Amino acid sequence: MYNGIGLKTARGTGTNGYVQRNLSNFEAGKKRWNKRDATDEVGSDTRLGPDAAILEHERKRAVEVKCMELRVELEDDDVADDEIEERVAQLRETLNAQLAEQTNESAASSYESGRAKETRLRHMGTHQQIQTKQHLDRRFAIAVGVESGYRQADAFNRDLQELKKSERIHQQRQAYQQRQLARASHASTQPPPHPPARCSSTHSQSTSSSSPSSPPRKRARSRSASQDSSARSSSSHASPRSPTPRTTSHVASYSSYSSRSRSRSRSRSPLSHSRSSRSRSRSRSRSRSRSRSPLSHSRSSRSRSPSRSRSPSRCASSRSRSPAHRPRRHSSSRVNPPGPPPRRPAGL
């Protein structure tokens, strides 16, 4: 077998399977098939798109199948032919009406999830599968935010991106102008709002208060003084009222504490005065003694000098006398044994 011509195997043919090529045949302008060019031109199944006529034929065929099922069921029940034809025609009309309302998009969107979807797609035709796949791809693109007319490598095309940017700016300006026109028309049709009565009264009060006779600072001071006087008068008027027991006890304790502190301060004032006078006299005497301190210091130094000179002799005498002045050690452990009794003289 050579170039797709001949038998797949020479077994049983009685020949060696050699096929001689025809060199006299020459095909001018024949283009060699390339896989890359074929995929670019044709594309995948989703790029081709389903055939609308085939899909319409499949839907009509499903209608006729249901009508035939009804006819067979009625014939098995021994129903009259006229009644069978009438009921089948009625079913066909209702199904055709539903078919007219149902579009390709709705038919593609009505699919199940999970195993039911897989089985339904498996039993579908090629064009129905392509239609359902296109619908799913469109839904995914909307969820991700990809435009409908997207093409590969459009993001690297600067001219196209500038054109899209200018179109977006133009659309935004048009939308802004439309909003402004709508607001202007709404404002022109709506009557102006009437000012409330309070605003006019407050305005009149403000105009009357801003009179040139009284400057603003004096008016502010007079207002603060009037507020203080009103607060004092309200406190004086509120004093005769019976306060709560908690506040009365607090006030009574505070007044008793203040009276005790005052009496203590008064009783202690003579002592403090006497103490302050004593401290003043002591400070004066100290200052006088400090002023006389140089002479006393010189005298004390003179008086102390002989004592310092005599100190070695005293130290020596104290050292020599130190054994006598030392305290005796009580030796309780070393006790002398009792000696013999005294002897009487022989003459007695």
Curated annotation (Swiss-Prot):
One of its GO terms (cellular component) is spliceosomal complex. Its main location: cytoplasm. One of its GO terms (biological process) is RNA splicing. Residues 337-348 have a biased composition (Pro residues). Residues 101-112 have a biased composition (Polar residues). Residues 55-98 form the CWF21 domain. Keywords: Coiled coil, Cytoplasm, mRNA processing, mRNA splicing, Nucleus, Spliceosome. It comes from the Eukaryota. This is Pre-mRNA-splicing factor CWC21. It comes from Mycosarcoma maydis. The gene is CWC21.
